[in-house]
Amino acid sequence: MLGPGSNRRRPTQGERGPGSPGEPMEKYQVLYQLNPGALGVNLVVEEMETKVKHVIKQVECMDDHYASQALEELMPLLKLRHAHISVYQELFITWNGEISSLYLCLVMEFNELSFQEVIEDKRKAKKIIDSEWMQNVLGQVLDALEYLHHLDIIHRNLKPSNIILISSDHCKLQDLSSNVLMTDKAKWNIRAEEDPFRKSWMAPEALNFSFSQKSDIWSLGCIILDMTSCSFMDGTEAMHLRKSLRQSPGSLKAVLKTMEEKQIPDVETFRNLLPLMLQIDPSDRITIKDVVHITFLRGSFKSSCVSLTLHRQMVPASITDMLLEGNVASILEVMQKFSGWPEVQLRAMKRLLKMPADQLGLPWPPELVEVVVTTMELHDRVLDVQLCACSLLLHLLGQALVHHPEAKAPCNQAITSTLLSALQSHPEEEPLLVMVYSLLAITTTQESESLSEELQNAGLLEHILEHLNSSLESRDVCASGLGLLWALLLDGIIVNKAPLEKVPDLISQVLATYPADGEMAEASCGVFWLLSLLGCIKEQQFEQVVALLLQSIRLCQDRALLVNNAYRGLASLVKVSELAAFKVVVQEEGGSGLSLIKETYQLHRDDPEVVENVGMLLVHLASYEEILPELVSSSMKALLQEIKERFTSSLVSDSSAFSKPGLPPGGSPQLGCTTSGGLE
């Protein structure tokens, strides 16, 4: 990412947002240029490898600082997941050497049609927009905007051309903007002179570069007004009307009266709605929830956007209970027929949670999982639905692992995307966070490397570290967070190692908070081992990590998994650092690591895996000549000889302890091989 600076210069390699190696623009072929937007040039491009069309908005930046600020503010938008929001597909900064200009590039979904084309076509034909179609797509827009406002995200650039049509009955909000870009006064003033139509959708306060959720409400009100009046008002008249409303809202009354005279469908709803949306003072405007209430509860609007059916009349509990008395198949049928009623979904899932394992169709009943995931998607903002659905998925997974340990949990993009959306919709809900982390940890360990990469690209590593740091007082968050972190690291494919530099210090804080917690120590040792293999522990952190690993072994020597991972981590660090080796053998308050090795061997002497990892640590310690006398005086030579005599199989002599199971072993010294200054 670009660093701060005030002078124009060509960015060096790596100073950009996510993108492919090399110059990001090189993978696109420019087809043609659209009308320029308020902030820059819009290019229709084709990705050369896939032949997929995109729109790239190129925003010229005066300096690196401006570009990096805008990029940093826009990056979180890449993680949005909603059926009616078209998120940016890529963000990057590029340099145009021909004109010596720096550009922030925003790659978006390409579509031929938007609300703008629909309005213009009806305006030319002087025809009314179909009421059923308008209710449907307006419901989708309201749902998307409610989702954004729920996350405290402001669109800032709502207008008909930024609501694209994916199909005749499916629309998406597009081109979300940032505060940095939308408060560039010079750029806005230039564009306003070129095209006064563009600023006509903006709220009065937005003209002074003050944006809030209420400014989105004004813009949406202008869009609804244009859609309802396009059959009798031309484009210039409509633009002047929008501008006049900023000073004299009374001009709206005449238009509403004309709408009534022209018998515009749903005019009564719009007469109630639009004056409340188009108040000059933003504090007097209604919220997006109020808009939904007026149109879909008090009004008679209907939409395929089922989340709006939260406002429907509830199904009596007695009827629901009667319908849910059958087997799994009949319960799923009820869930599908009443998909828009969250109370029905809750009762159905609670009924499924009580059913015995033999009735659930284990190991993983695909149809049941699909229905539960769909329910989570449809009711993503209903916390009780999310909690119950995750509980049911964990219940199914737990039962499956008990009765069918060889079974793999189904995991596809729909499932992971839904789980991530749940985290995003309810960022402060700890019980949900813990369950989602647990589900993702289990599925990640059973899936391919691509899933781990997908989750990392979605920002899950940073999410885990943020919550480990902010939720130290929550044991469940720490335990589930460490478990998921281990699962993400297990494949050894790390998209960005930089965030992992914080992990040793975070784990140190976790272990200090829970000094006698064996489960926490076990999870921590697993993460330390994988970090050591990945080279993600800095040299200045070696002593701290070695001390924590030894401390964990002393705490829970009876936990074989903890002991194995701790000795693997120690061996990995000692292999590359004499400082780490000295930390193992030095005498400290709890005793030396060498005495601990003896204790571990005696306790687990019949466990080949533990003995192998202990022996591997001894081999690496023996590679340092200055440590040899201490090893000999501590009878380590005799211990190593005993290990070699008792375990002559290849299990002990190979180096598989330093690889993920199933992957080829690394080049670690084999037990029994002569190393520099070894015990041989």
UniProtKB/Swiss-Prot annotation:
InterPro entries: ARM-type_fold, Kinase-like_dom_sf, Prot_kinase_dom. Changing G139D: In a glioblastoma multiforme sample; somatic mutation. Residues 1-25, 658-680 are annotated as: Disordered. Residues 28-297 form the Protein kinase domain. One of its GO terms (molecular function) is ATP binding. Disulfide bonds: none annotated. Coiled coil: none annotated. Keywords: ATP-binding, Nucleotide-binding. ATP binds at L34, N35, P36, G37, A38, L39, G40, V41, N42, K57. Belongs to the protein kinase superfamily. Ser/Thr protein kinase family. STKL subfamily. The protein kinase domain is predicted to be catalytically inactive. This is Serine/threonine kinase-like domain-containing protein STKLD1. The gene is STKLD1.
